[in-house]
Regions:
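C-terminal motif of bacterial Sec signal peptides marking the signal peptidase cleavage site
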Residues: 16-17
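Sec-dependent signal peptide recognition
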Residues: 2-9
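Active-site-proximal helices and loops of the catalytic beta/alpha 8
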Residues: 72-82, 87, 228, 234-235, ...
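Core domains of carbohydrate- and sulfate-ester-processing enzymes
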Residues: 99-151, 220-236, 242, 289-308, ...
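Short proline/glycine-enriched turn/loop motifs at strand-loop junctions of beta-rich domains
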Residues: 54-61, 96
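The feature marks proteins involved in alpha-glucan
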Residues: 22-46, 82-188
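Structural beta-strand segments of beta-rich domains
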Residues: 47-51
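Substrate-binding/active-site clefts of carbohydrate-active enzymes
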Residues: 165-341, 358-370, 374, 420
C-alpha cells in the first residue's frame, strides 16, 4: 500500500468515524465545582452497588437498571441524590451482578437521554449500557504475577504499530482467533510456507514495544453484526475506559472483552514485549447525544468565537483538556489503563490539541505508577485549537514537556515530500 492510499484510507476513517455537531452557546464553566474524591461510577459488592455521576448542572439524575445490555425497558428506575462538588450518588442494597445500567440527567427541565456514564469500565454490546460486574472475575490465571518487561532507557525502544484486525485477519496466518485480542496470545502460528505469524513474528523482529491502534470502545463498528464486513481504525471514541467489543470473542458479555484484553497483554509481556495504547482524548465520535454532552452540556468541549463547536481535530469537535474535570478525566483514564490493564505506554493522537499543563500532569501521575511507562504523541493538530498557542502541547514546545516524546514530521516530509502535496517531492 502506498502513502497516497494511506491518506485516502485515513480520510475515509475520519469520514465514517466522526460526525459534526450543532451550534452551542458558551457558559461560564469556571464556576463549576471540581470533584476531588474517588471518581468511581459503579462500586459493586454482593450486598450493594453504589452508583455515582458527576453532573454539576443537573436538576435531577436517575439510574436505570436493565436485565440486558441491549433491548428491552428498564425494570427499575432509582433517583440519585446530590452529594458534594457536583457528584450525585445512590446505593442499591441488593446483588446487581450481571445487570446493566444507564444514567439520565435532567437539565432545564429536559431529560438529556441515557448514557453509560462518563467513566464506564464495563459495558454491554455496542457500549450503550454499562454493566455491573465483579472485577475479580476479569483477571486471567496468572494476572497478579504479570510483570512489565525490563526497560533501561526510552532510547532503547523499538516500536511496532499494529491494528488488531489487520495484524491477524489473513486466512493463511494459522491463527484461530483472527482479528481479535486473543490472536496475540497464540504461539506457534505460521503460514503454509512456514513463515511465522502473530506473536512469534513480533518476537523474531526483535521489537520491544507494540503500539496498538485504538483499542478502547469506539463507535463505528456494530458489534451485533460481526459476521458482516466492517472496518475502521478506531479513532471515534465512545467509552474511553473499556476495551473494544468487536475484538472480543463475545461482545455481549462484559467480562469477556476485559479478560481477553488482559490475556493479550500478559502474553506480550511473557514474550518480552511492552504494550503501548494509542489514545484519542482530543475528540469524541459524536458531540450532541454523546456521553459527555448528555451529562454536562458544553463542559467537555471547546467552542469558537461564534459559539459553535471548535474543530481542531477535524472530526467535528475538540475536547477542553484545560478544564479541571476534563483534565482529571484524562489523568484518571490513563492511570486506570496502566494499573488495571498493565499498559506500558501511551501514544497521544493530535496531542497538540491538549494543553501543556494537562500533559505534564499525566506524566507526573504515570511516574508515580512506574517511570518506565512511556508517553509520546503527535505535536500538532488538524486545525487551529481554541486555546492560546503558548499553552498547547505542540512540537515547538517540546522543551516544556520533559519525558514526553514527539513525532517528527520533518523527517517524514524530507523523505516523501510535504504531507498533502503529492506533486512536490522531497
Amino acid at each position: 500500500m502506498n502513502l497516497k492510499q494511506l491518506v485516502v484510507m485515513s480520510a475515509v476513517a475520519v469520514a465514517t468515524g466522526c460526525t459534526s455537531s450543532q451550534q452551542h452557546t458558551s457558559t461560564p464553566f469556571d464556576e463549576y465545582p471540581v470533584y476531588e474524591g474517588e471518581w468511581v461510577e459503579m462500586a459493586y459488592t454482593p450486598a450493594s452497588t453504589r452508583f455515582s455521576l458527576w453532573a454539576p448542572s443537573a436538576q435531577e439524575v436517575r439510574v436505570l437498571l436493565y436485565e440486558k445490555g441491549q433491548g428491552g425497558s428498564a425494570y427499575r428506575m432509582v433517583k440519585m441524590e446530590p452529594a458534594s462538588d457536583g457528584l450525585w450518588q445512590v446505593r442499591v442494597d441488593e446483588d446487581l451482578k450481571g445487570k446493566f445500567y444507564t444514567f439520565n440527567v435532567k437539565i432545564d427541565d429536559v431529560w438529556q437521554g441515557d448514557t453509560p456514564g462518563l467513566m464506564a469500565k464495563a459495558v454491554g454490546v455496542n457500549g450503550d449500557r454499562a454493566a455491573v460486574i465483579d472485577w475479580k472475575e476479569t483477571n486471567p490465571e496468572g494476572w497478579n504475577e504479570d510483570k512489565r518487561p525490563p526497560l533501561k532507557r526510552f532510547s532503547d525502544m523499538v516500536i511496532y504499530e499494529l491494528h488488531h484486525r489487520d495484524f491477524s485477519i489473513d486466512t493463511i496466518s494459522g491463527i484461530r482467533n483472527r482479528g481479535r485480542f486473543l490472536a496475540l496470545t497464540e504461539e506457534g502460528t505460521h503460514t503454509y510456507l512456514g513463515e511465522k505469524t502473530g506473536i512469534d513474528h513480533l518476537k523474531e523482529l526483535g521489537v520491544t514495544h507494540v503500539q496498538l491502534l485504538p483499542s478502547f470502545d469506539f463507535s463505528s463498528v456494530d458489534e451485533t453484526k460481526l459476521d458482516k464486513p466492517q472496518y475502521n481504525w478506531g479513532y471515534d471514541p465512545k467509552n474511553y475506559n473499556v476495551p473494544e467489543g468487536s475484538y472480543a470473542t463475545d461482545p455481549y458479555q462484559p467480562e469477556v472483552r476485559i479478560r481477553e484484553f488482559k490475556q493479550m497483554v500478559m502474553a506480550l509481556h511473557r514474550a518480552g514485549i511492552r504494550v503501548v495504547m494509542d489514545v484519542v482524548y482530543n475528540h469524541t465520535a459524536i458531540t450532541k447525544g454523546g456521553n459527555f454532552e448528555r451529562t454536562v452540556p458544553g463542559y467537555f468541549y471547546r467552542t469558537d468565537e461564534e459559539g459553535k463547536w471548535a474543530n481542531a481535530s477535524g472530526c467535528g469537535n475538540e475536547t477542553a483538556s484545560e478544564r479541571p474535570m476534563m483534565r482529571r478525566f484524562m489523568i484518571e483514564s490513563v492511570c486506570y489503563w496502566a494499573r488495571e490493564y498493565h499498559i506500558d505506554g501511551f501514544r497521544f493522537d493530535l496531542m497538540g490539541i491538549h494543553d501543556i499543563e494537562t500533559m505534564n500532569a499525566i506524566r507526573k501521575a504515570l511516574d508515580k505508577i512506574d517511570p518506565t511507562i512511556c508517553m509520546y504523541g503527535e505535536g500538532w493538530a488538524a486545525g487551529k485549537p481554541q486555546l492560546p498557542d503558548s499553552l498547547l502541547a505542540m512540537k515547538k514546545h517540546a522543551a516544556q514537556l520533559p519525558h514526553i516524546g514527539m513525532f517528527c514530521d520533518e523527517m517524514r516530509d524530507s523523505l516523501r515530500g510535504p504531507w498533502g502535496n503529492d506533486a512536490k517531492g522531497a
